[in-house]
């Protein structure tokens, strides 16, 4: 893999007058419904990138679809909880059960990964295995993020930064959303919004320095983090005029079943029309 660029993040390199937006779908490869939604949202709508779960049942289908749609930027959706492992259970017994499944309890997982030093080399091995599975697809690595944003967990992030050059990490999601904008664009779920905004702000503050030091690029802000699976047409229409200058990401989970409202939003003619009227440029992470 090529060495990580030493250039600073694009938000510094680009003039402040322009507004550029990455529109990403997480969980690519998790199911046929999600795969279909991702490809249709890319072909028919505003979706520019998707994050691949390399250990899930529909991964091969997702890779084939991505090859048929080379303008879709595909990144790695690193999975270290609520999913399956790349390595066999006997290789990482502290991370998974006998079926190779990570825990479904985010708080407990976060505490164990932070405090149990004995798990760090197992985490490193699993992280490298998932990157190797992505590399085997032959797809260019557009970006890296984590399932339930675990890529910014202090222990996981340290491994990613330490091994960035060998893993080929050049672009990564910064999990920072704006609570004040979120309050203007949607209502309710205040405990979720406030608590998650505080966590994401703390995480983003502590990783910005290392990201810049290692030349790992990122968007300035990621919208949709505080929506709790409600990135619908109404939210996006309110968001677009509020986009700050520079580079932003809109985070989504489109599918044709459970989250069809998010798919519908991404292919909405009203949304596409507003993007054109506002002069917002749709980009991929590799365009940063």
Locate the predicted segments by residue.
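Terminal accessory/targeting
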Residues: 2-22, 32-143, 154-288
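DG-centered beta-turn motif at the end of beta-strands
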Residues: 25-28
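Active-site histidine-anchored catalytic micro-motif
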Residues: 145-148
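Alpha-helical and His/Cys-centered functional microenvironments
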Residues: 151
């Amino acid at each position: 893999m090529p060495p990580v660029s030493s250039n600073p993040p694009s938000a510094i390199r680009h003039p402040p007058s322009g507004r550029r937006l990455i529109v990403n779908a997480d969980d690519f490869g998790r199911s046929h419904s999600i795969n279909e939604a991702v490809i249709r949202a890319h072909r028919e709508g505003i979706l520019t990138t998707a994050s691949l779960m390399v250990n899930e049942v529909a991964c091969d289908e997702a890779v084939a679809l991505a090859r048929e749609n080379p303008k879709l930027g595909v990144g790695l959706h690193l999975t270290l909880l609520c999913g399956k492992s790349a390595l066999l259970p006997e290789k990482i017994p502290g991370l998974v059960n006998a079926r190779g499944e990570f825990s479904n309890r985010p708080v407990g997982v976060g505490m164990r990964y932070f405090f149990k030093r004995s798990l760090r080399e197992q985490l490193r091995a699993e992280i490298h295995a998932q990157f190797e599975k992505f590399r085997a697809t032959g797809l260019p690595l557009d970006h890296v993020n984590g399932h339930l944003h675990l890529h910014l967990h202090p222990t996981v992030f340290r491994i990613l930064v330490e091994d960035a050059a060998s893993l080929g990490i050049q672009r990564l999601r910064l999990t920072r959303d704006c609570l004040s904008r979120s309050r203007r664009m949607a209502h309710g779920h205040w405990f979720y919004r406030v608590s998650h905004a505080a966590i994401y702000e703390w995480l983003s503050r502590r990783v910005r320095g290392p990201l810049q030091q290692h030349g790992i690029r990122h968007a300035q802000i990621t919208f949709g983090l505080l929506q709790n699976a409600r990135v619908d047409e109404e939210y996006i229409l309110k968001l677009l005029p509020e986009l700050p200058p520079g580079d932003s990401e809109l985070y989504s989970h489109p599918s044709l079943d459970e989250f069809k409202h998010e798919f519908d939003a991404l292919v909405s003619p009203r949304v596409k029309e507003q993007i054109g009227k506002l002069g917002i440029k749709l980009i991929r992470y590799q365009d940063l």
